[in-house]
A protein has these predicted regions:
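Two-component/phosphorelay signaling modules centered on CheY-like receiver
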Residues: 16-35
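Short hydrophobic/Thr-rich beta-strand motif most characteristic of the beta2 strand and flanking loop
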Residues: 31-38, 46, 106
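Acidic catalytic/metal-coordinating carboxylates
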Residues: 39-42, 65-68
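Active-site beta3 strand of CheY-like receiver
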Residues: 50-56
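The feature encodes the CheY-like receiver
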Residues: 62, 90
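C-terminal output helix
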Residues: 110-119
Length: 126
């Protein structure tokens, strides 16, 4: 299966610089349709209006965290591939994310190679 580089990707983070970093890395990997949301609530609004092929979200955001966003998405029946990004790599976090239905997990800081390996694991080769 070939990954569709025209799929819509939603990057969710409350830090503008992080969304720009992830956007740049995704573009360097050939993805073209990248959108951003500043928090879980605005991400859910965007997802109500459009179908996304992938969501990459920071864990630690206010008022709705990335894990709360993931739970809300899964509760709605949406199985969109979801990658959580976090600076806190604890066994508890990994287990909580897996229980919530996460597809991939990335530790900060990360680079294009790390992102690509996670994307391949979640989406398949490209």
């Amino acid at each position: 299966v070939t990954v569709d580089k025209d799929m819509h990707i939603l990057v969710v983070d409350d830090f503008y610089t992080m969304t720009q970093l992830v956007r740049g890395l995704l573009k360097s990997l050939g993805f073209r349709n990248i959108e951003e949301a500043r928090d879980g609530g605005s991400a859910l609004q965007k997802m109500a209006e459009k179908s996304y092929g992938l969501v990459i979200s920071d864990w630690n955001m206010k008022p709705m965290s990335g894990i709360e966003l993931l739970r809300a998405i899964r509760a709605s029946g949406d199985n969109v591939p979801f990658i959580l990004v976090t600076a806190e790599n604890t066994v508890e976090n990994v287990l909580e994310a897996k229980a919530a239905g996460v597809n991939g997990y990335i530790m900060k800081p990360f680079n294009a190679g790390t992102l690509k390996s996670r994307l391949v694991a979640v989406l398949g080769d490209f």
